[in-house]
Every structure is written in structure tokens, then in C-alpha cells.
Amino acid sequence: MHCAHERICRRATYLCRGIFAYGTPVQTARQTLAQIGASWRATATATAEVREDILDILRLQNPYVETTGFDRGNLFFAVKKPVDKYKELVSYLKEKGYDTSGDSGIIYCLTRKSVEQVSFDLRNEGFSVTRYHAGLSDEERKENQENFIYGKRQIMVATNAFGMGIDKPDVRFVIHYNMPKNMESYYQEAGRAWRDGEPSECILYYEPKDVRTNRLFIENGEENSELDEETRKIVKERDLERLKQMTFYCFTSECLRQYILNYFGEKSSSYCGNCLNCQTQFEEVDITLEANTILRCLDALDWNYGAATVIDIVHGGKSQKILGKNLDKNPEYAVLSERTVP
């Protein structure tokens, strides 16, 4: 397009998806973007829903929208559920030689407290570590960030406050020490390991309390305090749904890359060969008998018992609780006494 008398302004607003990902009030978002006066917006990780939200906020008429591929083929994805997460982390770093090599990596933690603890412990292990979170002074954050970018420190331990605008090409791994609250955040942060196109690893350590912590953040919703009550409710429901999708990612036995790409609306192969699930052989087991027995056992109970109690019933347990509450009279008692129920 050639316009002799018209100046075309092209500015990329970094991560437009943040408009809705963080619950920014619509009017505030419109005012902010209007002040920028840009004619070109860009975002790296937006679902179809978020793209529609962005177009609505900008009030664009007949906009040209181009969606490129989300796949980052050089990234290896893995989800692990270690019993001792810190021990697993140290073992990984030493196995890969990050205690002696000059390669860089990022470890994301959910809270400032975790950042402080992990960075302190790794430093004591002899790793070249720095840290970043909103609780540090501006001066210290700037110094720590520059030490990481320019190679004075190899490992950055940080909350999600770190990363905006960072384009360090030689990041070889991104480890999520805790599960983030949504797939958008996860993929954005994991993508900081792919900038030079070389093979890199993205590992997520899952533990159940991550779900509770994220739910607490969502329930509190301090960043949504400017919204009216009805909008806050909508935002909270949306955020809880995204948390659920993030949790599903941690438990799927399917290709992790396929799960990610499908989440962002992109079709992909069911086998990528470059994620832990694709490199793991899952055995297909028929558990119809076990499932039906447990369901019938639950139907026969007149009270809500925990999973451990139900397992004891179908296994034929003889504990004081089972016998004292006459749970041995359940029609499914001991039906699975010879079977293993996880």
C-alpha cells in the first residue's frame, strides 16, 4: 500500500492477550491502546476467544487478521510428578551439566517465597544463580536481569514477573517448578527457551498444592478489583476454566505438543516424537470391572466417604473403621480383594 500523504504507524503492542488474561477492565484497556495509536497489534499466544476479545476492545472495523503457527518444534515438553521436587531439579541440572557449562536456563516459581528458597538452595549447591520477583527493589531487579542476559549468571529463578521483553537466544531450558494458572502463561514462558532455534527443554513439575495455590490467587482476584461484581464473576469463572485446562495438561497421556496446539485452535499430529509422553510407552489396561465395582460401592453408601475408605471396602479391609461402621455389609465388599486398585 502506498499513501503519499499519510503516515503509517506500525507499533507492536507486546502481548495484547494480557488485556484479558489479567482481567484488565475494558474501558481502561481501550483508553490505554487508544493513547498508543498503533495500527498494528501482535501477540504470540492467544486463543480464538482472546483474539475476539482483542478485536472487540480495539473496536476495529474490517481488520486484517493473520494467525501464524503456534508450533515450536525444537522444544521438548515434559510433565513430571517427582516425590522430591528439589532433588529432581538438582539431579536434572547436574545430569545436563548446568553446574559447569555456560548454558542458560530459567526456573519459574509460583510465589516469591519459592523463588527465594530455590535460588538460595541452588546457590549453596554451587550453581550460578540469580533471582527476580516483584518484591525486590528496582535496582536489584535490573542488576539481576542484566547479569542473566549478559551471561554473568547462568540460571534465573523467578516468578512470572520476569520475561516481558526478554530475548536471550541461548536459553536451553525452562523449568516450571510449579504449575502456572493457565496454558497461555505456560506456553509464553516456555517459549523463552526457543529463540535461537536450537533444541531446548521445557519441564513442568506438578504437585497437587499448585492447583490450590492458583485457585487461591483466582479467588482473591486482587488485579480485578476495578471490575464490577458481575464482570469479576465472569472473569473468575473463565480463569477457573483455564486452570482446569492447565491441570488436564499435567495428566494427559496423549502427545503434549498436540494438547498445546489443540488448545490454541491448531490441528496437529497425535505423535510429535519430541515430548515425554510420545517417548513413553503407556500400557492400555481394561479396568471396566474395577470402575463398575467402585461405582456400585459408592451408590450403596449412605455417606460421603473418602477414596481410601472406598478402596478398603472393595479390597475387603478389616480395619476398625470398616467393621465399626458396618461397611463390610456393602454389597461390593471384598469384590476386588485379589485385584490392585491404584
Where are these regions (language model features)?
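Catalytic cores of large soluble enzymes that bind and process phosphate-bearing ligands
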Residues: A42-A46, K81, L136, I234-R238, ...
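Helicase motor core with emphasis on the C-terminal RecA-like subdomain
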Residues: M1-E230, E241, E266-S270, N277
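Accessory DNA-binding and partner-docking regions appended to nucleic-acid-acting proteins
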Residues: T213, N224-D228, R238-D239, Q258, ...
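Short helix-to-turn junction characteristic of helix-turn-helix DNA-binding domains
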Residues: L93, F148, C250, L298-D302
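C-terminal accessory regions
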Residues: D239-K267
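Pre-recognition alpha-helix immediately N-terminal to the DNA-recognition helix
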Residues: P25, E88, Q245, T293-R296
